[in-house]
Amino acid sequence: MKIILATQNQGKLKEFQQLSKGKNFEFISMPEDLKDMPEETGSTFKENAFIKAKYVSEYFEMPALADDSGLEVDALNGAPGIFSARYSSSRTDLGNSKKLLRNMRGVAKENRAARFRCCLLGFHKGKTIFSEGTLE
């Protein structure tokens, strides 16, 4: 079975393809010229993964898997959260890291608890399957 991965991140695609080696399914990429991806307007990682997976599955008429993930910092009330990838105006890893460190200035080491949250959602023909994990 082929499952289209609802991302244009080639690194992420390679990771999923590696995980599926030797299995009875394979992950395939979306065409790079797909420009109509919907905005991630959800208020949770799960909602954003659903938006992407549903759109891609219905567009290509095949099973799709989407993920949404990010960093949640307790001292910042869960920020950057769903905005992790676009936390800074530059929307780059370096820019996001710099903004996070600026916002953490003055926060004591013992109050710097955080977690990385990843939500995976599969969608096909109106049915969903969902999994979520965190790394503290």
Regions found by a protein language model. Give the residues of each.
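Anionic-ligand binding patches
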Residues: 2-4, 11-136
